[in-house]
Amino acid sequence: RVLAAHPDIRLMLLDTSGKRLRAAFAAGNPDTATHVSVSVPGMNSTVADSVDGMVTEAIGLRQLASRQLAWLPGRARETVATIGWIGYQAPQIRARDGLPAMVQGAVEVSHDDVAAAAAQDLSRFYAGIQAARDIGPAHLTAIGHSYGSLTTGLALQVPGGHGVSDAVFYGSPGVAAAAPGVLRRRVEQDAD
């Protein structure tokens, strides 16, 4: 339904093998864009409940970034792609799911096990974005919200190259780094 309403959105991941769908989509072309961002949502995010809002957010972020580049001298030809990554089973704490599911969600959100497992997939997703490009690496920005910021922070610490240049965290419970310099060194190392 969302893709039909927005034919310019690219489906990058669709996994039906788990308890809930996992998906990623892009506004713009991440294979050719100068700047690419990957947004990871947090607790209570599901493809069914979150994709509409995340598509709207991706389109809006792309438009805003493109306008800002157009205003900067010598940057008007740079392009932007924004990706929404609901590629993990985020913890769920919803009254509609009943008390046992809420307790399970509370346990999941109080530990980093779900985020740590998802971090492996997210790190590979970042690396895959860069590997799929024929024109050299993109300026890749990792964006994490809420529990998604923990997932993003852990993904940036996975050994190996992920190609992320910058990271943004908001509404964050923490990023599981001993100090800000840990993430800065990993991002700078991968951006080189």
Model regions: which residues?
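Serine-dependent carboxylesterase/thioesterase catalytic core
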Residues: R20-A23, H35-V40, S45-V47, M54-W71, ...
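Short, conserved catalytic or adaptor-binding loops enriched in Gly and charged residues
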Residues: V2-A4, P73-A76
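Intrinsically disordered, low-complexity charged segments of secreted bacterial virulence
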Residues: R1-L21, A27, D31-T34
